[in-house]
Amino acid sequence: MEEAKTENCMICGSVLEYLKEAIEVTCNFCGKKEAAYIRCPIGHYVCEQCHGKAALDVIKEFVLTTKEREPFSIAEVLMRHPQVPFLGCEHALITAGAFLAALRNSGKIQISDEKMSRTLIRVQKQSIAGYCALNGCCGIAIGISAAFGTILGATCPKDRESAITMHAFVRVAEAIANDVGPMCCKSFVRTALGVGYNLAKEYLNIELPIDRNIRCLFSKQNPHGCRESKCLYFSKNGR
């Protein structure tokens, strides 16, 4: 099989169709049948599990071993990795992983490899391509709230821990909503980590180092078109 494409259709590179109604599709990799709102015009389809399998391994290995304490730096390295497409739920994993790794590496909080790995799996299960627009629930926002859920040990019977976790989601989701038009996972990751930085100070009393001079190198790759000057991270020198 040819190497998977990282832009548009993973199989042929064609621009994907975003549908108003779900259709039944079959994953070209594993054969699973399901309903989907996104497809290749030629008929190719890759399910969420197959779409993110290779990237999950890459992201997990990197965030578990990096010593970097600045969350944007961790995320930027991963977003440039060849296994990570321009758009996709892999960015939810990057957000959660970069945030947790930065917090752990700050030395002010202990987070085990097992807890970080389980968080990534939870985020992957709840992040579905296209649902950011269809349902208004972006997996990147879940990445930050899931990190808080792990750190605080939030469960349904708990009060403050669960409330903080939900507030984290709402605040990231609101910031992302103000950054929409068109959708851009790269921008959303940066926005989410910026909110995560503020949340860490507020709820965990941890002030992470943060790079305030991020400039995007992906502006010419967005199949929906770049927001350019409307984006906080736009660079005229973007590839």
Name each region found by the language model.
Residues 1-6, 15-23, 38-41:
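Short, flexible, mixed-charge glycine/proline-rich loop motifs
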Residues 6, 24-27, 37, 44, ...:
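Residues immediately within or flanking Cys/His clusters that coordinate Zn2+
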Residues 9-12, 27-30, 40, 47-50:
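Short cysteine-rich clusters marking metal-coordination/redox-active sites
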Residues 14-18, 35, 45, 55:
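Short functional micro-motifs and their immediate structural scaffolds
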Residues 91, 131-150:
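Conserved phosphate/anionic-ligand binding catalytic regions in large, soluble enzymes, centered on
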Residues 151, 158-201:
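A structural-propensity feature for long, helix-poor, extended segments
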